[in-house]
Amino acid sequence: MPKRGKKYLEAAKLVDRFKAYPIAEAIELVKKTNIAKFDATVEVAFRLGVDPKKADQQIRGAVVLPHGTGKVQRVLVFAKGEKAKEAEAAGADYVGDTEYINKIQQGWFDFDVVVATPDMMGEVGKLGRILGPKGLMPNPKTGTVTFDVAKAVQEIKAGKVEYRVDKAGNIHVPIGKVSFDNEKLAENFTTIYEAILKAKPAAAKGTYVKNVTITSTMGPGIKVDPSTVAVAQ
């Protein structure tokens, strides 16, 4: 394990590692234990009872957080003609076709999200080995392969986040910054929690949400009691 600094150890003393806190209390603790000198990101980690090795237990999707993440997302759109104009009008940072494919192949990555129209995927597919490992490959499940490029760009700019289960059965999602009001962080948390509950694979057996932890960029993890979260039925 990496050696922890004095500030981290002092912050960690405020947290009972064996307790799952009500969401409101957990958010308050995230702020108290934040040791970063910058406006740290608040992230939630879900440990799920799924086997990601099985195709019918993969979880991937996207949801628009009501208060965004506090980060301005740079959006690259692969589109032509009218669709390119729509993407530009919606606020995309970069819009084009083959010229951006060449740039990426040469090591350009000044973007955070990639959107593509379906007719461009034949060309964009050439970037699979480059974009895939970085989690940047457009995908219909996350709404980033679509002809409605304007809606896709607007949602991303408004605070849309993607979630995807990793090989260990975990999902990590940013829900804002420590500077956010507690209520806004709680509402963002509830939104992503509801999305993950709805995404439960039919093949998943036993306890689905095993563990929920919330943390700031450099702070200690704080367990959350999911039963304290009011979710829509």
UniProtKB/Swiss-Prot annotation:
InterPro entries: Ribosom_uL1_bac-type, Ribosomal_uL1, Ribosomal_uL1-like, Ribosomal_uL1/biogenesis, Ribosomal_uL1_3-a/b-sand, Ribosomal_uL1_CS. GO terms for cellular component: large ribosomal subunit. Keywords: Repressor, Ribonucleoprotein, Ribosomal protein, RNA-binding, rRNA-binding, Translation regulation, tRNA-binding. It comes from the Bacteria. The keyword Ribonucleoprotein applies. Gene3D superfamilies: 3.30.190.20, 3.40.50.790. GO terms for molecular function: rRNA binding; structural constituent of ribosome; tRNA binding. One of its GO terms (biological process) is regulation of translation. Part of the 50S ribosomal subunit. Belongs to the universal ribosomal protein uL1 family. Binds directly to 23S rRNA. The L1 stalk is quite mobile in the ribosome, and is involved in E site tRNA release. Protein L1 is also a translational repressor protein, it controls the translation of the L11 operon by binding to its mRNA. This is Large ribosomal subunit protein uL1. It comes from Geobacillus sp. (strain WCH70).
